[in-house]
A protein has these predicted regions:
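Flexible, compositionally biased loop and terminal segments
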Residues: 1-295
Length: 295
């Protein structure tokens, strides 16, 4: 299957008909399961992203926000490492979001991510995001109690209202020059178990493990239901969700890379045209440098 068709399959364009179960975490789309076979494609994607980021930075009219959501061990860090490895760090910022601090709890639920949005010309990557407020907080109602919300802000329709708030927030960003791409790295429960065991077996990765990871597995079905509701309610043409099969890491890297490249190419970014006084200064500088004696 060619990449454009793969992206169409992964992008949630008709959220009203979306079913998480229709997306197989182990799907390979006909791609080789041997990572060595796809390394050339990955390398080409990295090079193209590097070029597009240079145009984004020089153009300075657009910001890019990449949202990564997934269960523990779904491969969010790996996507950042392997897909964005060619991007200039000066034009890219990565933010990971953990349990909220006391300061964050004193603000509205979108405040934490709002203050970390990328500026024009830059790429912002959210490793988890404001969507935790309709995922983890929904699965764990005790987290909601910590937010000290007024009674009128809490009720059976709170999640629908939060979905609406998120969509309004993202529409505002889109209208003002932020390209938003959201990726749900879909991993199977069995593959997560294998990756947890691999972490425990490898001393260099044990630091990533938390007993809470095992405890959260007991709520797997609740999380899947929350993800399905979230994607159905918040996948829009201006901020689409992509459901990425993540049991095979390199497949996830390829698809995420292709989605970012496709979206950036759609912006038709060009380097600024130099003319007038600025062009005259460049030509003057060129003449002066050529006139200097070497050595």
């Amino acid at each position: 299957m060619k990449l454009p068709k793969i992206l169409k399959h992964c992008r949630v364009d008709e959220p009203g008909h979306f079913r998480l179960a229709a997306h197989d975490p182990a799907e390979c789309f006909g791609l080789s399961t041997n990572i060595d076979d796809v390394k050339p494609i990955l390398a080409a994607g990295i090079a193209r992203l590097e070029e597009l980021q240079q145009r984004l930075y020089a153009n300075g009219q657009w910001a890019v926000l990449l949202v990564l959501q997934g269960m523990d061990a779904a491969g969010k860090d790996g996507v950042i490492k392997h897909v964005m490895s060619g991007v200039n760090p000066q034009g890219c910022e990565v933010h990971g979001f953990k349990a909220p601090s006391e300061e964050e709890l004193r603000h509205d639920f979108l405040w934490t991510t709002t203050v970390r949005l990328p500026e024009n010309g830059r790429i912002g990557i959210f490793n988890r995001s404001h969507y935790e407020e309709v995922l983890a907080v929904r699965v764990h109602p005790e987290m909601l109690a910590r937010q000290k919300l007024p009674l009128r802000a809490v009720g059976k329709d709170i999640w629908q209202r939060r979905f609406q708030d998120i969509c309004t927030f993202e529409r505002h960003l889109s209208r003002n020059g932020t390209l938003i791409l959201k990726f749900h790295l879909r991993i199977s429960r069995e593959e997560q178990r294998k990756r947890f065991l691999a972490r425990l077996d490898e001393p260099a990765k044990r630091w990533k493990f938390s007993m809470n990871d095992v405890i959260e597995r007991k709520r797997w079905d609740e999380y899947m239901a929350a993800y399905e509701d979230m994607i159905r309610a918040t996948s829009t043409d201006y901020a689409p969700w992509y459901v990425i099969p993540a049991d095979h890491k390199h497949v996830a890297w390829l698809v995420v890379s292709a989605a970012i490249i496709e979206a950036l190419e759609g912006l038709k970014l060009e380097f600024p045209t130099i003319k007038g006084k600025a062009l005259a200064e460049i030509k003057s500088a060129e003449r002066a440098l050529k006139a200097e004696k070497s050595g």
